């Protein structure tokens, strides 16, 4: 998957519509830097939220995504354009949040919603439906995507302080080497089985 453009509106610290054009970075590698609280992690939250309906960190929930600085009339949403296997996709998604009613000053809850486009054609609509479709397109769920594609700022501490066995499991998930581990365990079981069979026959 290659990100092309991310549009954040009233999302996290971004009170107004903010556009990040990834196509400007031609070298393939670029650095996202800034002071604490500037919104670096929010960029990853926006991408992960667009794809799977949840932000990148386990400590942030949908109802925490609306910017505290946004005007009442500003819609909270994320638009993410990307390419995958030579196909162009666009996702528009909004979280559940409290907004001002269109009639009067009462506050009402905006329901989560999403639309997935492929080459300007609607593929599916609905928050859960888009998430399910993205899991099928990318071949991984949100947890697998996070472990392979990004380690959020807070989640990185889990890796630093993980014990030996737990750290090994994290790295297996990150680098996709579970199949090697399972193959190794299969060989061990086969070895023990052959060894037992040999000892039984030798005892006879």
Residue ranges and their predicted role:
Residues 1-132, 142-144:
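Extreme N-terminal "head/tail" segments of very large remodeling/mechanoenzyme assemblies
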């Amino acid at each position: 998957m290659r990100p092309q453009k991310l549009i954040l509106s009233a999302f996290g610290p971004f009170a107004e519509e903010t556009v990040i054009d990834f196509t400007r970075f031609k070298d393939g590698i670029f650095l996202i830097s800034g002071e604490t609280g500037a919104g670096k992690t929010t960029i990853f939250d926006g991408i992960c939220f667009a794809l799977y309906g949840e932000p990148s960190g386990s400590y942030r929930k949908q109802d925490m995504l609306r910017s505290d600085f946004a005007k009442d009339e500003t819609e909270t949403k994320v638009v993410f354009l990307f390419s995958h296997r030579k196909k162009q996709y666009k996702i528009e998604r909004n979280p559940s949040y409290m907004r001002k009613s269109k009639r009067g000053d009462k506050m009402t809850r905006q329901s989560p919603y999403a639309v997935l486009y492929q080459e300007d054609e609607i593929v599916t609509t609905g928050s859960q439906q888009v998430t399910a479709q993205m899991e099928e397109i990318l071949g991984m769920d949100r947890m697998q995507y996070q472990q392979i594609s990004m380690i959020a700022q807070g989640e990185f501490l889990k890796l630093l302080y993980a014990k030996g066995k737990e750290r090994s499991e994290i790295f297996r998930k990150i680098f996709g080497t579970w199949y090697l581990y399972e193959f190794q365990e299969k060989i061990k079981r086969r070895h023990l089985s052959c060894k037992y069979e040999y000892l039984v026959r030798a005892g006879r």
